[in-house]
C-alpha cells in the first residue's frame, strides 16, 4: 500500500503538471502583479482545505504577504461534524466576510476539492465583488459528479476567475483493497500543497525578473534570520495582523 500510494501521488502530480502548468503560470503572474502593486495573497478553505492556507503562511522559504482567512467554526478543532454542517449552509459566510479586508489589488485563492458547498462559493463571490482576482483550487471530476449545495446552483469552478484542477478523484480516496469496503488514502492535501508552492515559486521568479525583490521568509532557525524577517513583518503586518510577533503588535 505504501508503494501504491506513492505511485498514485506521483501519477496525479504528473497529470497536474501536464494539464495545469499554463494555468499555474497565469496564476503566478497574477500573484506577482498583486504583490508588486502593493496587494496581498489571501487564502480560504474549510475543513481539511484550510490546512493548505496555513501551509503557505509564515513559511520558511515562502512569500511574506500571505494571509489565511481562518474561521474557527469551519475548521476541525471546534467540532469536525459541525464544521461540515456549517460549510453546507447557504449565507453562513455573511457573518465573517463583512470583517474581511479584501482589496482590488489582492489575489484570493479559494480551496475546496468537492467545490459543491455554499461557503467557498460565497467567499469566491465576495472576492470578485471586492475586485480581487479569484483563483479556485478544486477537483473538476469531483465537482461535476455531485450537485451543488449552493442556492444558485454554482460550484466553485464556475464562481472564480481562474481554476486550477487538483485532479482528485470523486471522494478524494485513491486506494482500495479487497478486504476493505471503503476507498481510502486521500490526495488533495499533498497535491494542493504542491500546487500552491509551485505557483508561488513561479511568482517569485517573475518578480525577480521584473526587478522587484520578492518578500521571502528565511527560516527562523537560521542565525540572523530574525532581523531579516522582522523587517518584512513590519512592512505587511498592518494588512496581515496575524504576522505580529505578539498580541500587542496586532
UniProtKB/Swiss-Prot annotation:
- InterPro entries attached here? RpiR-like_SIS, SIS_dom, SIS_dom_sf, SIS_GmhA/DiaA_subfam, UPF0309
Cross-referenced PROSITE patterns, in alphabetical order? SIS
The record, for HAMAP family, names:
UPF0309
Q: Which domain of life is it from?
A: Bacteria
Q: Which Pfam families match?
A: SIS_2
- Gene Ontology MF terms in the entry: carbohydrate derivative binding
Q: Tell me the protein family, please.
A: Belongs to the UPF0309 family.
Occurrences of domain SIS (ranges): 31-214
**NCBIfam families the record matches:** PRK02947.1 (NF002805)
Name assigned to this protein: UPF0309 protein BH0227
Amino acid at each position: 500500500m505504501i508503494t501504491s500510494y506513492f505511485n498514485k501521488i506521483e501519477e496525479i502530480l504528473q497529470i497536474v503538471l501536464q494539464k495545469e502548468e499554463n494555468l499555474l503560470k497565469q496564476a503566478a503572474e497574477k500573484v506577482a502583479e498583486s504583490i508588486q502593486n502593493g496587494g496581498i495573497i489571501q487564502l480560504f478553505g474549510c475543513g481539511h482545505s484550510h490546512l493548505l492556507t496555513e501551509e503557505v503562511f509564515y513559511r520558511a522559504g515562502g512569500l511574506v504577504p500571505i494571509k489565511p482567512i481562518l474561521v474557527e467554526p469551519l475548521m476541525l478543532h471546534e467540532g469536525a461534524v459541525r464544521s461540515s454542517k456549517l460549510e453546507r449552509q447557504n449565507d453562513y459566510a455573511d457573518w465573517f466576510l463583512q470583517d474581511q479586508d479584501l482589496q482590488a489589488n489582492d489575489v484570493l485563492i479559494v480551496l475546496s476539492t468537492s467545490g459543491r458547498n455554499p461557503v467557498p462559493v460565497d467567499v469566491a463571490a465576495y472576492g470578485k465583488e471586492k475586485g480581487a482576482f479569484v483563483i479556485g483550487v478544486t477537483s473538476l471530476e469531483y465537482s461535476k459528479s455531485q450537485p451543488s449545495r449552493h442556492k444558485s446552483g454554482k460550484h466553485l469552478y464556475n464562481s472564480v476567475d481562474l481554476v486550477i484542477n487538483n485532479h482528485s478523484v470523486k471522494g478524494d480516496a485513491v486506494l482500495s483493497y479487497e478486504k476493505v469496503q471503503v476507498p481510502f488514502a486521500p490526495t488533495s492535501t499533498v497535491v494542493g500543497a504542491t500546487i500552491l508552492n509551485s505557483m508561488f515559486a513561479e511568482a517569485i521568479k517573475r518578480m525577480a525578473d521584473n526587478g522587484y525583490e520578492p518578500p521571502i521568509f528565511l527560516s527562523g532557525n537560521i542565525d540572523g534570520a530574525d532581523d531579516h524577517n522582522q523587517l518584512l513583518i513590519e512592512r505587511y503586518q498592518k494588512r496581515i495582523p496575524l504576522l505580529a510577533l505578539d498580541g500587542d503588535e496586532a
